[in-house]
Amino acid sequence: MSLLPTATISDIARHNGRVVTLAGWVAHKTEKGKLVFIRLRDGSGVMQCVVFRKNVAEETFIAAQRLTLESSCRITGTVRADERAPGGFELDVNGIEIIQIAPEYPIQPKEHGVEFLMEHRHLWVRSSKQHALLRIRAEIIAAAQEWLNAQGFVRFDTPILTPCAAEGTTNLFATPYFDLGTAYLGQTGQLYVEAGMMSFGKVYCFGPTFRAEKSKTRRHLTEFWMIEPEVAFALHDDNLALQEQFVSAIVQRVLERRADDLATLERDTKPLERCVPPFPRITYDEALRLIAERYAEVEGCTPLEWGEDLGAPHETLIASMFDRPVFVERFPSAIKAFYMEPDPNRPEVALCADLLAPEGYGEIIGGSQRIHDAALLERRIREYGLNVDDYRWYIDLRRYGSVPHSGFGMGIERATAWIGGTHHIRETIPFPRMLYRMYP
């Protein structure tokens, strides 16, 4: 005996005219006299199933009447084309096997507050828009890894528990580590992936990262996922070219394969269709001039002094001036990470860039050319007030066959928010971790 279905809703078209068994959950039900209309979802799609009393056994009709929202069941019937039905097909039911009758479902088809939905996140992920957004997230992850693999990159897994900071010491999650002192949840895999780069040439890591930032903005999570490529011999401009090819390939893949999900989210795809290389590039200095001229156009945006970092309103303003993602490059070294290569023509700025998504979604990628000189790297570590001994292994990478190299990190959640067109990053990961949210 098996409970597995004989067909899935996503490929129901090839079963037209045949008897199939679907297995899933009741997304909606309507009773009209001798008819019961059941919208069944199976994870791959949603299909209307029609139970006509005179065509089925009495126990089947009673079973249809008993079904409640989110009840689980197996439904057998004949697939019939009907352009009025969702997906263009419906099921003429001849049998229902109830797996479980669900009690009253907490999330009813009415307006619920965000806090209520977040408390019931384990159930909210079943809703059509959350399902569509998480499908897009999965497609982005698959597209990113498959594109990198096709370009000759090797996945190189990095540790989550680390002995030191990689992106500054003010936002670390610390935990006791046996007799060895304190371990920290990794802020990035980048330092370790550089070791892999010296072995394989082109590598990437993919996994969760953790930032103990006390931020409540719609763009921040304390736990998020990053994909971080690193390339030997790549200079700053090579890095930017790789990023725009990478992002463009991901967007095109989502447009091609997840059109139905984008439609469910009511996403205007025209801005995504314009996401093709080359992306515009402006310097940090140029960004400051544009902000000074037009800051009044965005609420909360104010002019910046040289050496101040861009905030969310500044990123929104800059991105609004372009019709596709835009690079802001060559930030002051003092406001960036210690490992970034200084511009040889202007050492006070780093060979780095942030890629800003259009439509107010902010930074989706941060990257740089890395320092490849051991003495300079050690000096920068000291200047940042970090313990050099914690980074001996990292400095070692520059002592044995060092080469110029570059890399970047793309946050999966921010990319998903932008491509999916959702306002808040909390909906782009199954179970978001935020400053005041750790349940469920």
UniProtKB/Swiss-Prot annotation:
What does UniProt give as GO cellular component? cytoplasm
**Highest taxon listed in the record's lineage:** Bacteria
GO BP field: asparaginyl-tRNA aminoacylation
The protein's matches in PROSITE patterns, at most eight in alphabetical order, are given as: AA_TRNA_LIGASE_II
- Enzyme class, UniProt record, top EC level: ligase
Q: What is this protein called?
A: Asparagine--tRNA ligase
A GO MF annotation of the entry reads:
nucleic acid binding
User: Which family, according to the similarity comment?
Assistant: Belongs to the class-II aminoacyl-tRNA synthetase family.
Keyword Translocase set for record: no
Q: What gene name is given for the protein in this entry?
A: asnS
Question: EC no.?
Answer: 6.1.1.22
Instruction: Give the catalytic activity.
Output: tRNA(Asn) + L-asparagine + ATP = L-asparaginyl-tRNA(Asn) + AMP + diphosphate + H(+)
Where is this protein localized, as stated in its record? Cytoplasm
Is Transcription regulation there in the keyword field?
A: no
What the entry lists under PANTHER family is as follows: ASPARAGINE--TRNA LIGASE, MITOCHONDRIAL-RELATED, ASPARTYL/LYSYL-TRNA SYNTHETASE
Sorted UniProt keywords? Aminoacyl-tRNA synthetase, ATP-binding, Cytoplasm, Ligase, Nucleotide-binding, Protein biosynthesis
What Pfam family does this protein match (any one)? tRNA-synt_2
InterPro entries attached to this UniProt entry: Aa-tRNA-synt_II, aa-tRNA-synth_II, aa-tRNA-synth_II/BPL/LPL, Asn-tRNA-ligase, Asp/Asn-tRNA-synth_IIb, NA-bd_OB-fold, NA-bd_OB_tRNA
* Organism field: Roseiflexus castenholzii (strain DSM 13941 / HLO8)
Subunit (UniProt): Homodimer.
Task: Give the classification, highest ranks.
Answer: Bacteria, Bacillati, Chloroflexota, Chloroflexia, Chloroflexales
Chief subcellular site? cytoplasm
